[in-house]
């Protein structure tokens, strides 16, 4: 697993794509923070969590939804295209080590991106006290959400040898889970009750407002595990078929 992790981190941090994604992510995150802070200042007296951090976390989750498919699209699709997946199988590596190494590498990149946004509460703390609890809850939600996104992207990347297809399909699948309950008026009460538990949008709401619900934590972890298990199944099926 360490070998896969080191290789993937090297590929990430020496690729132009990472620096493009990081630049766009941090510039947009900074812009959103500035506009949210301006809104908070203009409407003085608002609760800091609901007046600033809630909207900032909403904006960051949107950025993760857009950027993570770009980070995961090559993880296994490129190995399939180049035929190097079979080469990995010649090493003393089990499938779970390959999957875990690639997943961990992408999560390190996500941590780096989110780490860059920690400057905002640090700067704000020089002007007024900042409660750590709501921030911890919000970032916990972002990490869990990002973990679920990465697992989904890794699974889809295992199904194709095209990075473009993998990235586009990942974004489409995640967006579907995101907007499941947006058009509530068009859904029956039974359908709404069935779909709400699977809505990633709804699962993040409590985190953004400074709370942590164990049901949301459990769902996001199960979502992640399910897609990682699917990735293992896809690799195992490919190994047994013996095709490229």
Please place each PLM-identified region on the residue numbering:
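Long, hydrophobic alpha-helical segments
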Residues: 55-78, 113
């Amino acid at each position: 697993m360490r070998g896969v992790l080191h290789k993937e981190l090297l590929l990430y941090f020496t690729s132009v794509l990472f620096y493009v994604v990081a630049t766009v992510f941090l510039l947009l995150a900074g812009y959103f923070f500035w506009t949210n802070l301006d809104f908070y200042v203009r409407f003085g007296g608002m609760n800091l969590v609901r007046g600033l951090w809630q909207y900032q976390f909403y904006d960051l989750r949107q950025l993760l939804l857009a950027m993570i498919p770009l980070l995961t699209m090559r993880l296994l699709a490129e190995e399939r295209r180049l035929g190097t997946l079979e080469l990995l199988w010649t090493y003393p590596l089990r499938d779970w080590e390959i999957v875990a190494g690639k997943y961990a590498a992408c999560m390190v990149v996500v941590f780096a991106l989110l780490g860059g946004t920690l400057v905002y509460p640090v700067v704000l703390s020089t002007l007024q006290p900042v409660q750590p609890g709501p921030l911890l809850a919000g970032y916990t939600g972002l990490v869990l959400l990002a973990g679920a996104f990465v697992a989904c992207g890794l699974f889809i990347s295992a199904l194709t040898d095209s990075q473009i297809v993998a990235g586009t399909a990942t974004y489409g699948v995640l967006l579907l889970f995101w907007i499941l309950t947006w058009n509530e008026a068009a859904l029956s009460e039974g359908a709404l009750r069935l779909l709400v538990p699977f809505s990633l949008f709804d699962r993040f709401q409590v985190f953004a407002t400074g709370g942590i619900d164990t049901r949301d934590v459990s769902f996001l972890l199960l979502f992640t595990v399910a897609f990682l298990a699917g990735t293992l199944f896809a690799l195992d099926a490919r190994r047994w078929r013996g095709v490229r």
